[in-house]
Design a protein with these regions (language model features):
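Short linear functional motifs in flexible/disordered or boundary regions
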Residues: 10, 81, 112, 130-131
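Non-catalytic protein-protein interaction segments used by genome-maintenance enzymes to assemble
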Residues: 77-116, 120, 124-125
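Short coil/turn segments at beta-strand junctions that form active-site/ligand-binding loops
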Residues: 65, 94-96, 129
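Metal-dependent nuclease catalytic regions and adjoining charged, substrate-binding loops involved
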Residues: 37, 107, 120-144
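A non-catalytic, helix-rich entry segment at domain boundaries
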Residues: 1-78, 139, 144
Length: 144
C-alpha cells in the first residue's frame, strides 16, 4: 500500500480497506492461506500501512526529495542477469539516492540479501551517485 498511496494518514479507514481489498487476489487464495477472510486481511493491511505512515523516519525520507515507487530494473551482477522491483527510490540530494524496501513480519536473512542485490543494481544504474539502501519493517500492535 505504501507504493500505491504514499503517506496518506488523512484517508478514512473504510476507504483504505476498500483499496486494500482491490489489491488482493480475487480468488481469496491469500486469505485462505492464512485462515482469514479477505476483509480481515484488508484490515490487517490497513493497520500495517497506518503504522508505516506513522513512522517519523519514513516520513522524513519521503519529504527528502522526489520519489519513484515500484521501480523495475534489470542488471547484470557478477555475470548473472537480475530482475527486480525496488519498492521506493528517493532522490535525497544531488547525486544521492536512497532505496527503501518495505517488509512486514520479522527480519529474515533473505531480506538483507535482496536489499544488497538492489543496492548493487542501483549503483550500476546510477553511476556517480551515492546510494543508500534501507529495509523498513512495518510494525503494528498485535501484528507480526
Amino acid at each position: 500500500m505504501m507504493q500505491r498511496f504514499g503517506l496518506d494518514l488523512a484517508s478514512s479507514t473504510s476507504m483504505l480497506q476498500q483499496a486494500a481489498l482491490r489489491l488482493l487476489p480475487s480468488d481469496e487464495g491469500l486469505a485462505a492461506s492464512v485462515e482469514r477472510t479477505t476483509t480481515e486481511v484488508a484490515e490487517a493491511a490497513v493497520e500495517l500501512y497506518r503504522a508505516m505512515c506513522g513512522r517519523t523516519d519514513v516520513r522524513a525520507l519521503y519529504a527528502a526529495g522526489p520519489r519513484l515507487h515500484e521501480v523495475p530494473f534489470t542488471a547484470s551482477l557478477n555475470g548473472v542477469v537480475v530482475r527486480g522491483t525496488i519498492d521506493c527510490l528517493i532522490h535525497t540530494g544531488p547525486d544521492e539516492i536512497t532505496i527503501l524496501e518495505f517488509k512486514t513480519g520479522q527480519p529474515r536473512p533473505e531480506h538483507q540479501v535482496q536489499l544488497d542485490v538492489y543496492h548493487q543494481a542501483a549503483v550500476r544504474l546510477f553511476p556517480g551517485s551515492s546510494v543508500d539502501a534501507l529495509l523498513v519493517y512495518a510494525t503494528a500492535p498485535g501484528l507480526v
